[in-house]
């Protein structure tokens, strides 16, 4: 790409020691004080796989964090292990929320903890139902009916259980059975509980939603329940169900009241938990907004910055296009890492994707093979499309609202002295752990040596194994006098 004159972005030469900053490229260092810059701190980073989004944007952001609260979504545990000691030394409270292996983290998330009103119940149900909509061809009638049924079951659990968790709601759904009466209306094993609630308050929220379901014809009710059950099964894995029983719960107010770093680990290859993670983000934004509204100045005491790696992979965050429009006034900001604008539009739709882009005052383009994205960048930067498509590896274009585009190189994180120290200490810890594992393995007999994958697989099979009676025991269980029911069935 031909060299072009660049205009200064008014990048300050010096900042006070220990001030939060944003490093967005070689020589591109900015304050995060919105009052000074006049801009919001929302950043959209676009680059193909391997373009350096994480190492050149995310890791420098963590390096330059001293007083802001951080919510960092990662698929690579190395980042978590690498930066926890650094942030702890700076006085950060570390929260580790691992959706892949919940027991590995030090905190859990239960959506039931944030129910403060009947409106919250409805929001939770709608978020769960809509989270899987992208993977289905939904009929809004079935989704709305399933949400109404889920409203009833959540409310019933909250009203009748001591210290309820979402695991209790899931157990209620799992145990629910439906049958029909002589008039073809629905009967279930929960009818008595809802009659009891109705006797206490005929207009209570749980019974009102339950009547909507129980007055349906049995076949229609069966379809509604099937819709809900399939969504629940695809959203809440056995690992998540275990997490709901963990004692230490996440409280979003902590992010706003003290300097906190929350690391969220998801899987890059397991899409089954994506809808639940989207629910988590929706709940987090809602809780932080509500908490900010309760403050005298309408803002969070501590600014909260969300770093969302692979933001456009998985399921859309409910209402995110609305949230991002008002993040700044609550002292909340986001860094969204995506591979292309097309990817964002395919997840959120063209209108919502445009809203998200327009509410990011900073845009970092690090190269992509996506033609539509390159065309937009070509128009925005006023340079030929050919130059965009042929951008050298390691180069980038930085857009800041109110300034001309800045053409330069991505930030060389490995040349940062503090990062070199972080990396050095991390490698020492990894090497020490490796030596310990080698010692343990060397003490085992050769026939007991299995790789990690085999051990995990074997442990899982042992955990779920159910001993099945032998064929003889099945045969012996039928007496000579009794008819062979199975044989009769097959004859029919």
Model-derived regions: residue spans:
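P-loop NTPase motor domains
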Residues: 3-8, 16, 20-332, 383, ...
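A broad, structure-centric signal for solvent-exposed, well-ordered loop/edge residues
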Residues: 52, 64, 271, 363, ...
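Short secondary-structure boundary/capping segments
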Residues: 86-89, 111, 350-353, 379-382, ...
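Flexible domain-boundary/linker segments
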Residues: 167, 245, 297-298, 344, ...
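Short conserved micro-motifs at the rims of enzyme active sites and ligand-binding pockets
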Residues: 275-276, 347, 375-378, 408-412, ...
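Conserved ATP-driven motor cores of ASCE-family P-loop NTPases powering translocation/secretion/packaging/pilus
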Residues: 324-406
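Short, intrinsically disordered/low-complexity patches at protein termini
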Residues: 368, 421-422, 430-433
């Amino acid at each position: 790409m031909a060299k072009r004159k660049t205009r200064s972005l008014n990048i300050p030469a010096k900042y006070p020691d220990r001030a939060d900053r944003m490093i967005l490229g070689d020589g591109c260092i900015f304050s995060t004080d919105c009052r000074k810059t006049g801009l919001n701190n929302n950043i959209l980073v676009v680059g193909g796989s391997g373009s350096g989004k994480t190492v050149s944007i995310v890791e420098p952001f963590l390096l330059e964090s001293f007083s802001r609260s951080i919510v960092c979504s990662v698929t690579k545990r190395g980042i978590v292990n690498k930066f926890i000691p650094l942030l702890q030394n700076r006085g950060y409270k570390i929260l580790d929320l691992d959706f892949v292996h919940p027991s590995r983290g030090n905190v859990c998330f239960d959506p039931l903890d944030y129910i403060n009103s009947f409106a919250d119940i409805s929001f939770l149900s709608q978020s769960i139902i809509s989270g899987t909509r992208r993977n289905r061809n939904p009929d809004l009638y079935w989704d709305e009916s399933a949400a109404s049924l889920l409203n009833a079951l959540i409310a019933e659990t909250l009203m009748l259980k001591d210290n309820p968790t979402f695991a209790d709601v899931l157990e209620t759904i799992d145990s629910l059975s439906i049958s029909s009466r002589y008039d073809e209306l629905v009967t279930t094993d929960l009818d008595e509980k809802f009659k009891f609630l109705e006797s206490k308050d005929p207009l209570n929220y749980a019974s009102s939603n339950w009547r909507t379901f129980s007055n349906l014809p049995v076949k229609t009710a069966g379809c509604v329940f099937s819709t809900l059950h399939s969504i629940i099964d695809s959203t809440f894995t056995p690992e998540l169900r275990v997490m709901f029983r963990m004692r230490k719960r996440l409280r979003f107010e902590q992010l706003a009241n003290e300097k906190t770093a929350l690391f969220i680990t998801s899987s890059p290859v397991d899409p089954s938990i994506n809808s639940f993670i989207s629910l988590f983000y929706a709940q987090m934004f809602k809780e932080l907004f509500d908490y900010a509204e309760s403050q005298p100045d309408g803002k969070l005491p501590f600014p909260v910055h969300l770093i969302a790696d692979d933001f456009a992979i998985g399921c859309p965050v409910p209402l995110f296009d609305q949230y991002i429009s008002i993040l700044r006034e609550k002292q909340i900001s986001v860094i969204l890492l995506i591979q292309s604008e097309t990817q964002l539009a395919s997840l959120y739709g063209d209108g919502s994707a445009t809203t998200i882009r327009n509410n990011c005052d900073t845009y970092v383009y690090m190269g992509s093979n996506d033609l539509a994205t390159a065309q937009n960048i070509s128009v925005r930067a006023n340079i030929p499309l050919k130059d965009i498509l042929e951008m050298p590896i390691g180069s980038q274009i930085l857009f800041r609202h109110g300034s001309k585009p800045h053409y330069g190189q991505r930030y060389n994180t490995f040349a940062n002295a503090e990062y070199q120290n972080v990396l050095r200490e991390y490698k020492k810890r990894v090497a020490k752990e490796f030596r310990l594992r080698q010692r343990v393995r060397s003490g085992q007999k050769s026939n007991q040596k299995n790789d990690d994958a085999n051990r995990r697989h074997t442990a899982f099979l042992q955990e779920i194994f159910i001993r099945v009676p032998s064929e003889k025991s099945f045969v012996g269980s039928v007496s000579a006098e009794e008819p062979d029911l199975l044989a009769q069935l097959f004859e029919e």
